[in-house]
Amino acid sequence: MKKREKILLLFLALGLFLFGCGAAKQPPSGGEPERLNLYGVDFGLEDEELDLSYIRIGDGWRDVLKTARRMPNLKRLVMDSCGVQNEDMAVIRDALPETEVIWRINFGLQYTARTDATRILASSPSIGGNVTNRDLKKFKYFTKLRFLDIGHNEDITDLSFVRYMPDLEVLIIAMNPLGDLTPLADCKKLEYLELFYSRTDDLSPLAGLKNLKHLNVGHCPYLKDISPIYDLELERFYLGTFASCPVPPEQVEHYRELHPDCEVDNESWESSEGAWRRAACLEGEKLEWYKKQPYYSEERQYYAPRYALLRDQLGYDGLQYSTKWNDPTWQYVGW
């Protein structure tokens, strides 16, 4: 055999060998996708969800991230109570922009919620403990929150966390020594806001909130000017008496003239009662409209319509506070 033919045969044999090696690495046609086991959980690389909840992962979160990056169809990664720091969970979330990454946040003494929560009711220190500014630093991870009640906690002064809540519709922050409302300017979907018994003196951050319809600023002793929100098309505006909220009467009357359809109350003393929560004597079309709403019931016939809806949104009926015993997904893990 000539030398040239030997060289050609050698190259041909080498090519067949390399092709065979490559083919061996591929799964057989029509075979099952590759499966892995991570922390005792069996899953496939083609899976759309990976749930590692209640497994102590801690510093092993990097292995989870490395694996998740190999899963092209991954839509949800759930790591509830895995002992991973919030900051590290945020790294995973940011590294997987096409995947919903979910973990658990504990706050107060008994309050808890997963980061995919849309509602948090944490307004009873006697039930869940006091919510503090330190707790609220963790609220930036609740990016899907729509309804939030953290009133009655007495120590809250920082609202910066709401900048991370683009879908926030309802905020009750009443009975806290809060002053600066600047972060609320980013909450473009905000529709309902209770600020009574706070230290706010400037409503200008609310001026651009075109969806805001219900505003309660009763018993805000430092508030003396409502002119920044003259253009807001509110449906209900509660200020309380001049003694409790010293806004000049001429400003109140000017707002009434600008918005004749708005229910403006600067006469009632109690900021959470009266027409704010209790229905006036509804008659005719208004009464018939109210009866057709899904949140209406015979038990709620004396509630103001918006307050009846609020009870549904925040789970007031049944005292659905965001506590461990009210959360069906919570489990004790011991770490």
Question: Where would I find each of the regions flagged by the language model?
Answer:
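Bacterial N-terminal signal peptides that target proteins for export
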Residues: 1-8
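Hydrophobic membrane-insertion alpha-helices, especially the h-region
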Residues: 13-16
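Concave beta-strand-loop units of leucine-rich repeat
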Residues: 30-157, 161-179, 183, 189-201, ...
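C-terminal motif of bacterial Sec signal peptides marking the signal peptidase cleavage site
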Residues: 18-20
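Bacterial signal peptide processing site
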Residues: 22-24
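Short, solvent-exposed mixed-charge patches
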Residues: 334-335
